[in-house]
C-alpha cells in the first residue's frame, strides 16, 4: 500500500508541525472553563445537561431555588486542565446524592439526639428518617456544550492551519 501526494506539501507539513507545537493545556483549559460556566448556568436555570427541569420539592417552599440554600455546592464546582484532559467537578461528599438521587437513605442525627426539620408549617423531630431525594443532575455535557467544544477546537485548528 502506498500514498502519493501531488503538489506542494509544504503547507501540510507546516500545519502538522503547528499541531505538534500546539498548547494542549491552553486548549483544554478553555474547554474546562466553558464547561464550568455552563454547569453554573444550570444551577440558575434549575435544569439538567439535557435541559430537563429539576424535580420540585415535595415539602417546604417551592419558590426557593433548589440546591442553593447556602451556595456551597454551586461554589464548589471547579475546572481543571492539563495537556491531556479537561475536567469539571466537585469534591463535596453529598454532590453525588444530588447528581444521581437516592432512594430509602437512612439519615441519623450526628451532633444532637434528634433531627429537627420543618414539613409545611410544622416542626418535626426524629432520631432518624428515611429520605428519597430525586436526581437533580448538574454535571454533564449538553448539546450546547458539545457545540462550544467544537467551536474551541475549530479555532485552534484554524490557528494551526494559518500558522
Question: What residue spans do the PLM features occupy?
Answer:
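Short, Lys/Arg-rich flexible segments
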Residues: 1-163
Amino acid at each position: 500500500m502506498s500514498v502519493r501526494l501531488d503538489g506542494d506539501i509544504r503547507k501540510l507539513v507546516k500545519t502538522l508541525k503547528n499541531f505538534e507545537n500546539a498548547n494542549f493545556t491552553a486548549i483544554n483549559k478553555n474547554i474546562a472553563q466553558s464547561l464550568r460556566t455552563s454547569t453554573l448556568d444550570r444551577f440558575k436555570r434549575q435544569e439538567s445537561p439535557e435541559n430537563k427541569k429539576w424535580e420540585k420539592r415535595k415539602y417546604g417552599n417551592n419558590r426557593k431555588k433548589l440546591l442553593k440554600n447556602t451556595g456551597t455546592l454551586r461554589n464548589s464546582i471547579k475546572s481543571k486542565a492539563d495537556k491531556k484532559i479537561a475536567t469539571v467537578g466537585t469534591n463535596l461528599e453529598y454532590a453525588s446524592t444530588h447528581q444521581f438521587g437516592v432512594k430509602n437513605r437512612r439519615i441519623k442525627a450526628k451532633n444532637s439526639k434528634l433531627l429537627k426539620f420543618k414539613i409545611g408549617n410544622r416542626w418535626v423531630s426524629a432520631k432518624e428518617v428515611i429520605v428519597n431525594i430525586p436526581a437533580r443532575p448538574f454535571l454533564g455535557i449538553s448539546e450546547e456544550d458539545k457545540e462550544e467544544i467544537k467551536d474551541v477546537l475549530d479555532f485552534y485548528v484554524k490557528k494551526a492551519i494559518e500558522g
